[in-house]
Amino acid sequence: MVKVIVLLPRRGDMSPEAFGQYLRETHLPLVTKLPGLRRLVVNWVLPDPNGSPPAYDAVSEDWFDDAAAMGAALASPEGQAVAADVPNYLDLSRFALLVVEEEDVPLPTGSAASPAG
C-alpha cells in the first residue's frame, strides 16, 4: 500500500473558510473519483500554539494499492481533472506532494496507546 501525502496551502487571496468550502465541495469530490483510490483522509491544520498561522491549511492522505495504481490514477482522465483543479485553490509555490509507505511502529507495553496499556 502506498500513500500520497499532500501539503495543502491555500491561495493568498482565499480566506480559510473559502478554502475549506472549496476543498470539501469542489476538489474532494474530484479526488474521490480517482480509479484505484482505497482511502482518503483530510487533516485540518490547527493554529500553532504560539498563535502564528500554520504553514499549511490541510494535509490530505490518499491510499492506493501500489505505486502502479497511484500512477494509473494520476494519469487517468479523473487524475487530470484533479490536477487541473489544483491552481484554483492552492498556493503552488508552497504545495508539496509526498509518496510514502506507512510503517506502524509498536509501542512499548504499558504505554498509554499500546493495547495492553
Residue ranges and their predicted role:
Residues 1-117:
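Macromolecular interaction modules
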